[in-house]
Design a protein with these regions (language model features):
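Conserved alpha-helix/loop element of class I SAM-dependent methyltransferases that forms part
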Residues: 1-9, 23
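A short glycine-rich, Lys/Arg-flanked "PGG" loop and its adjoining helix->strand segment in the class I
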Residues: 93-108
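A short acidic, Gly/Pro-enriched loop at the edge of an enzyme's catalytic core
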Residues: 68-79
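Conserved Class I S-adenosyl-L-methionine
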Residues: 153-190
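Short alpha-helix
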Residues: 132-148
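Short, glycine-/aromatic-enriched active-site segment of Class I SAM-dependent methyltransferases
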Residues: 114-131
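Class I SAM-dependent methyltransferase SAM/SAH-binding core
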Residues: 11, 17-69
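A short SAM/SAH-binding and catalytic strip from SAM-dependent methyltransferases
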Residues: 79-90
Length: 190
């Protein structure tokens, strides 16, 4: 999803500590980077990183907020990124509707997350392990279309994630235990 972002507004939904957002700054600095998360602790880390000499030249705004009720103006964002966040939200349709609302026409939206491989609902899996809230790729596709977001591309990262977990480079055994998929999607707002 790396396109020239000069003079663009980029939003990281579920910024956490900012790993993805700050990597994007290194690749293609935008006019403004906005990070939103419901975790004050993660945002505190992201704010501190944004003040480091490496990033202090960039305009960064970190907001404590609800991803299902974004405090962002309509049609004001050029690019949106989100990693491993959607499956943690109870109202995925509401979050995608908000993404569609704030995205400019033609905005690029990159979302990567874990997905279930079947429609079987979760029973006792915890939300912290990113299992209980996961939906299928088909359900995700339908939700996107219902709010005016179109899938322009997707990459299946399942095998890469499985290898990282098996090699103990990613502490997420539940991913293997529940036979999850991991996908990255490029969405475009109509």
């Amino acid at each position: 999803m790396v396109h020239p972002l000069k003079d663009k507004v980029v939003l990281d939904l579920g910024i956490g500590t900012g790993c993805l957002a700050f990597r994007s700054l290194e690749l293609s600095p935008p006019k403004l980077l906005v990070g939103i998360d419901f975790s004050a602790t993660g945002l505190c880390v992201a704010k501190n990183i944004s003040k480091q000499s490496k990033f202090q030249q960039y305009e960064c705004d970190m907001i404590l907020g609800d991803l299902e009720k974004l405090p962002i103006a309509n049609r004001s964002v050029d690019a949106i990124i989100s990693q491993a966040t959607l499956n943690l939200l109870p109202d995925k349709c509401g979050a995608l509707r908000e993404i569609s609302r704030i995205a400019k026409s033609g905005a690029r939206i990159g979302i990567s997350d874990a997905f279930r491989t079947s429609n079987k609902s979760s029973d006792d899996e915890s939300w912290e392990q990113c299992i209980a809230g996961a939906i299928t790729v088909s359900e995700f596709s339908q939700l996107c279309l219902s709010v005016g977001l179109f899938i322009a591309g997707q990459v299946d990262l399942t095998q890469q994630v499985r290898m990282l977990v098996a090699d103990k480079k990613w502490d997420w055994p539940e991913f293997l235990e529940h036979n999850m998929d991991y996908r990255a999607f490029l969405l475009v707002r109509s």
